[in-house]
């Protein structure tokens, strides 16, 4: 399994680990943000696909923040050196995500959207996501009701903004950690105080 650091696991991760990939290289959730952008009137994302990615079916583009990886198959597609060489090429917007989509096209097992529910950053649910095909948008909206993994993709993070989408889920887990007070202090701009200096007399009396 590979997972980005800006997410919360809200379901049984063993279910994800046990995903049967067969001969496929990767298991992943379709990227509703990318797919929605394909249908935007400005045509920028569609043009990027044609000129840079050259994918046969860009609507199969997946989000690389949560991946089930068949490492044996990945090494058959490219050696580690080849993967790194490809990754060093310029011109990609989403770097590793773009490269994985291009090189693994046709080798993907698509997961239920609940395994990578991207939160509503900057109102994208009703400004980008809803431009995706109806079946894609409906599957995403259904996954929001029972997310197994919530992905805080984008600039709006619950540890910076407690009012962002799905922030309550993040903080419900944060409250179970021994450092929640420090997290709240950091979010509030409270700096850690310097350790107090011992008074000479107090030390002498010890």
Language model regions located:
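Short, mixed-charge, low-aromatic patches
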Residues: 5, 52-59
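Short, glycine/charged-enriched secondary-structure capping and boundary segments
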Residues: 16-18, 41-43, 82, 165
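Generic hydrophobic, helix-prone segments enriched in Leu/Val/Ile
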Residues: 26, 46-49, 170-173
């Amino acid at each position: 399994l590979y997972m980005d650091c800006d997410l919360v696991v809200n379901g049984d991760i063993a279910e994800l680990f046990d995903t049967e990939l067969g001969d496929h290289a990767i298991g992943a959730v379709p990227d509703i943000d990318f797919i929605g952008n394909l249908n935007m009137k400005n045509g920028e994302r569609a043009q990027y696909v044609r000129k840079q990615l050259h994918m046969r079916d860009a609507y199969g583009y997946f989000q690389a923040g949560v991946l089930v990886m068949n490492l044996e198959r990945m090494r058959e597609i490219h050696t580690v050196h080849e993967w790194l060489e490809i990754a060093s090429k310029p011109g990609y917007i989403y770097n590793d995500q773009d490269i994985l989509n291009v090189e693994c096209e046709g080798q993907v097992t698509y997961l239920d959207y609940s395994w990578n529910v991207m939160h509503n950053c900057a109102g994208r649910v009703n400004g980008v996501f809803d431009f995706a095909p109806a079946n894609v948008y409906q599957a995403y909206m259904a996954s929001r009701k029972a997310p197994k993994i919530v992905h805080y993709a984008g600039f709006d993070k619950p540890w910076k903004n407690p009012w962002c989408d799905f922030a309550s889920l993040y903080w419900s887990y944060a409250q179970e950690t021994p450092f929640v007070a420090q997290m709240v202090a950091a979010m509030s701009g409270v700096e850690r105080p310097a350790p107090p200096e011992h008074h000479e007399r107090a030390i002498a009396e010890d």
